[in-house]
Amino acid sequence: MPRDIITLGCTECKQRNYTTTKNKKNTPQKLEFNKYCRFCQKHTLHKETK
């Protein structure tokens, strides 16, 4: 399967809040999104984790 499931973790509280998919051939770098963290109760940077 070309698309791999990845999780996005909050950089402030380290909670893993979101899952998404990505094609590792097209985007070899780690993904970063500004998303809402329900534990911090604000928008924070979420980075790709294992």
Swiss-Prot record:
Query: Which family does the entry's similarity section mention?
Result: Belongs to the bacterial ribosomal protein bL33 family.
Q: What is the protein named?
A: Large ribosomal subunit protein bL33
PROSITE patterns noted in UniProt:
RIBOSOMAL_L33 (PS00582)
**The keyword Chaperone is annotated on this UniProt entry:** no
Q: Which InterPro entries match?
A: Ribosomal_bL33, Ribosomal_bL33_CS, Ribosomal_bL33_sf, Ribosomal_zn-bd
* Biological process (GO), any one: translation
Keywords for this protein: Ribonucleoprotein, Ribosomal protein
MF terms (GO), sorted A to Z: structural constituent of ribosome
HAMAP family assigned to the protein according to its UniProt record, in alphabetical order: Ribosomal_bL33 (MF_00294)
The gene name on file is rpmG
What is a single cellular component term in the Gene Ontology annotation?
Answer: cytoplasm
Q: What is the lineage of its organism?
A: Bacteria, Pseudomonadati, Thermodesulfobacteriota, Desulfuromonadia, Geobacterales
